[in-house]
Amino acid sequence: MPGFELWSDEERKEVNEVLETGILMRYGFDGPRKGKWKAKELEEAICKRFGSKYAQLTSSGTSALTTALVALGVGAGDEVILPSFTFVASFEAVLSVGAVPVLVNIDETLTLNPDAVRKAISSKTKCIMPVHMCGSMADVDALASICKEHDLSLLEDACQSIGASYKGRHVGTIGNAGTFSFDFVKTITCGEGGAVMTNDKEVYIKCDGYSDHGHDHKGGDRGADLHPFLGYNYRISELHAAVGLAQIRRLDQFLKIQKQNHSQLKNILSQIPEISFRKIPDPAGDSCTFLSWFLPTEEITRAVVNEFRAQNILAGNFYWYDNNWHYNRKWDHLKNGSSLSPLNDKQQAALQKLRSQDLSGSDAIMSRCVSSAISLLWTEDQIKEKGEKMMSVIKKLLHAAEVR
């Protein structure tokens, strides 16, 4: 899945150019940096590659979400609707701006169920945040229609779906704003990093300042900049941006390999009629970082996962239902409001509600789901061997369940 699997001299060259100048910060020091502006170059490359008018780099996908939420005017007491299956950072980002995360059931796209979203809208709802999990995408048209109907912002968390598209447009560029993560296990990586993309100039200007202590970047030097609003330090470094600049040039190479390997593994597992696959709203746009598949029952799925573990073939096959970081069932620290800084009353009330919320619709899907991460390093023979081992286990346990 991740770009770190295929390091090359291109990444080393970009990093060395930064080290040769000695200027690791993205802003200022115009003379000593000798014309090297890696963060600016990467932002331009993101806009060109994904078709966004503006891009603002940040230190992580989480800080990108936080920055985007603030730029969209989300704040204390506002409600943000997001899926119950997501990396915990999506939830944390909403809390970090004083807003209230509202989790809803997913469907077999593994992200927001539009019907569940409609039912969750209240007078306090400010934003809908689809999370394009595991390389694919939400039903963006349905969610955009809901946002338009209720005058809500659409913020795409595309941190896990770099390179995916929906009806010809890259995910992360369709809503009012979208975010990418470039951490170590994303399709392209900076080591750590993120980006906000938007086609709205005002949103971009706010992101640009908010991610750098409120600097308006209009002064002759940093000391002459004004600070029209509060901001924080969510800057990316030139070193991290340099790695990303090399990686984005190689994205098509990575996606081609991912899709080939994904297709080969899917063809093997498709031989088992009891297996069904994740619903992809636009199959041509799947970035293919994961192959997500379902078994008939939770009992059979758990038995398969346990046997994978026993046979040492579980690595890379994720059973999110028991995962501490990606599914709300394991988020007791959040549900209990275990924060080192006190949460506001509205947030505490929302967390209290979450503790008893019925998300059985999501449970029914996630308890039967396994996601197989797609490596860029696999050979055809390795995929064949892996797939056949997986298929053997699954068939054996399906048969055992049938004869009981």
Language-model features: locations:
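Conserved PLP-binding active-site segment in aminotransferase class I/II-type PLP enzymes
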Residues: 1-62, 66-70, 148, 366-367, ...
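Active-site region of PLP-dependent enzymes
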Residues: 29, 34, 161-167, 174-290
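PLP-dependent aminotransferase-like
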Residues: 70-158, 165
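Short amphipathic alpha-helices in soluble, non-transmembrane regions
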Residues: 207, 302-311, 387-390
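Conserved PLP cofactor-binding pocket of PLP-dependent enzymes
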Residues: 214-222, 264-269, 305-369, 401-404
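Conserved PLP-binding active-site segment of the aspartate aminotransferase-like
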Residues: 279-281, 288-298, 315, 319-337, ...
